């Protein structure tokens, strides 16, 4: 079969039928909403954000707050205590801003990221935003687990590295899902998010962490499910962007229909959810009666469920409202 002509830029006008319905997933895993969300007061959050000096315009802080990233964070990081949630929320807000303003549009590159994570660098000594990030890490360490914080720092840098790598790739419409997710899997940020939600716990033992099945569970299944949840629910806000970095857009060109692309993404995601459940059971059979593994697998499932139900929540305006990142870019 002859390969279709490659498309490198998204254009909604390439499709006659522009209406679509977001699909539901066969997801029965438990999720909860962090009970300390209401204690992270808006006024406190605004003052903290202003202290980062990441925005140049005063009004941009209020616009960012209106995106309610803290609301989604309460879905993703539902198990931490008040202090853990406060500092993880701050880290995620910092990351959202860095991604939207600097990394996504390639304003900063790999050299900047390398310096950002080097406490002996010139950037750390001279740039307020860099020292602010490390203050957040120090606060997380004081409230959480030290080893888990080191792991989180590592995964935060890996995520930033992956954004830069993904931006350097020329994504086109003939990508298979496997090809797309191999680049997008880390860039979507959910391994970083998983490190956030586990920061109050001791890390898994090396025997489990380095087991091929556990690595496959995260790298293939967890990442792929999260990529599809993100792409399905962020499609609304990305529909006017020419960037092709969304699997629904890629599948739409392959299938000739946005709705067909949504339905196709749903099927892939449901298949991965079913397969991941089987992989979890297989891991538990290899490491029977291991309470640490059971806890970590539970958290892996709850962060997937939290991402899904948070993305669907009509009170979350980033995916379900009229406010978008472009308003403060």
From Swiss-Prot:
Chain's role: Terpene synthase that converts its substrate farnesyl diphosphate (FPP) into 6 yet unidentified sesquiterpenes.
GO annotation terms (biological process): terpene biosynthetic process
EC number of this enzyme: 4.2.3.-
A GO molecular function held by the record: metal ion binding
Alphabetized Gene3D superfamilies for the sequence: Farnesyl Diphosphate Synthase (1.10.600.10)
Encoding gene (name): TPS7
SUPFAM superfamilies in alphabetical order: Terpenoid synthases (SSF48576)
Motif extent (DDxx(x)D/E motif): 99-104
Protein name (database record): Terpene synthase 7
Chain positions of motif NDxxSxxxD/E motif: 230-238
Domain of life (superkingdom): Eukaryota
Notes concerning its domains: Contains several highly conserved motifs that are important for catalytic activity including the aspartate-rich 'DDxx(x)D/E' motif and the 'NDxxSxxxD/E' motif, both of which are involved in complexing metal ions to coordinate the binding of the isoprenyl diphosphate substrate in the active site.
Recorded family membership: Belongs to the terpene synthase family.
UniProt KW Lyase keyword: yes
Organism listed in the record: Dictyostelium purpureum (Slime mold)
Annotated keywords: Lyase, Metal-binding
Enzyme's top EC category: lyase
